[in-house]
Amino acid sequence: MNDSALDIITAHARDGARLRETFFAEQATMLRETALRIAACLARGGKILLCGNGGSAADAQHLAAEFVNRFLVDRPALPALALTTDTSALTAIANDMDFSQVFSRQVEALGRKGDILVGISTSGNSPNVLAALEAARRIGMLTLGFTGRGGGRMAALCHMLVDVANPSTPLIQEIHITAGHLLCQLTDYYLFENVAALAPYLHADTVNED
């Protein structure tokens, strides 16, 4: 019996490298603009809320930790909170209301106008993430989506969209966390190294009204 493990490894590495090169070549300007808006939100005293399910929940927690602790350089802590970690709140909302509201209820409690909600869903159609984005827009928050396959229903609810045009969920997730790392690095850059670039964003109304 032939062992095709090495072929599987080679194919995955090849496909991932091709997707990564294409995505970042095409989306560099979008990532820069998104980082500027995140940095401006934080500079104005806002915060970042993040949500997702399964692997996307892990990404939400991972990125929140990078903001709160540090990324590549020592700097002040930045306010970010993953809405996936409070088991008492999650189970109470799911039990008393509905699982589709586990994030939106927290957004209603914690979100403020000018804050940013990051919703992560490889399909772009997770009901509880959609509900959270809708709640965020009602409050006047900026919405950032990490999606795949064209963005699904999330595309219409996001002011900023990191969409990975690929059918493979694992490859989408790999690009998501790499893009998230870049946004952390660029946010630090604009907050602590190139503050002048933030000037046009600090006083602009960055929320597009529906």
From Swiss-Prot:
Enzyme Commission designation: 5.3.1.28
One cellular-component annotation, GO: cytoplasm
Top-level class of the enzyme under EC nomenclature: isomerase
Cofactor(s) required, per the database record: Zn(2+)
Cell compartment(s), UniProt: Cytoplasm
Textual note on the cofactor: Binds 1 zinc ion per subunit.
Keywords, comma-separated and alphabetical: Carbohydrate metabolism, Cytoplasm, Isomerase, Metal-binding, Zinc
GO biological process entries: carbohydrate metabolic process; D-glycero-D-manno-heptose 7-phosphate biosynthetic process
InterPro entries for this protein: GmhA/DiaA, Phosphoheptose_Isoase, SIS_dom, SIS_dom_sf, SIS_GmhA/DiaA_subfam
This protein's record includes keyword Zinc: yes
Reactions mediated catalytically: 2 D-sedoheptulose 7-phosphate = D-glycero-alpha-D-manno-heptose 7-phosphate + D-glycero-beta-D-manno-heptose 7-phosphate
CDD domains (alphabetical): SIS_GmhA (cd05006)
Positions with a binding annotation for Zn(2+): H62, E66, Q173, H181
Pathway: Carbohydrate biosynthesis; D-glycero-D-manno-heptose 7-phosphate biosynthesis; D-glycero-alpha-D-manno-heptose 7-phosphate and D-glycero-beta-D-manno-heptose 7-phosphate from sedoheptulose 7-phosphate: step 1/1
Secretion signal span: none
Gene3D superfamilies assigned: Glucose-6-phosphate isomerase like protein, domain 1 (3.40.50.10490)
Residues binding substrate: N53, G54, G55, E66, N95, D96, S121, T122, S123, S126, Q173
Residues covered by the SIS domain: 38-202
An MF annotation (GO) of this entry: carbohydrate derivative binding
Assembly with partners or alone: Homotetramer.
Function recorded in the entry: Catalyzes the isomerization of sedoheptulose 7-phosphate in D-glycero-D-manno-heptose 7-phosphate.
Family note: Belongs to the SIS family. GmhA subfamily.
Other facts noted in the record for this chain: The reaction produces a racemic mixture of D-glycero-alpha-D-manno-heptose 7-phosphate and D-glycero-beta-D-manno-heptose 7-phosphate.
Stated name of the protein: Phosphoheptose isomerase
